[in-house]
Regions:
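DNA major-groove recognition helix of helix-turn-helix/homeodomain DNA-binding modules
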Residues: 48-63
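Short alpha-helical DNA-recognition segment
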Residues: 19-34
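Short basic helix-loop element that most often maps to the first helix and adjoining turn
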Residues: 8-23, 52
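Short, charged recognition helix plus adjacent turn
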Residues: 43-44, 62-68
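A detector for short, charged/polar N-terminal pre-domain segments
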Residues: 1-5
Length: 68
């Protein structure tokens, strides 16, 4: 999964739930800068932060074999 997929999914979920980036940071316990970096598609974000944010929406990150 590349950073653009994560970024797009996070933005979509946040907007569907009517949350601002500040709201998302507060509710997930992740810093605002981390939320912004995730939504900007920064490739070097920490996986624990990604997992923490998606957990708020009921998602978990799991390894999945690539389809060739």
């Amino acid at each position: 999964m590349n950073s653009n997929v994560i970024s797009s999914a996070l933005k979509k979920l946040r907007k569907e739930y009517g949350l601002t980036q500040v709201d998302l940071a507060m509710k997930s316990g992740v810093g605002l800068n981390s939320v912004r970096e995730l939504e900007q598609g920064k490739a070097t974000v920490r996986m624990d932060k990604v997992a923490q944010v998606f957990d708020l929406f009921g998602y978990e990150l799991v390894p999945q074999k690539k389809v060739k």
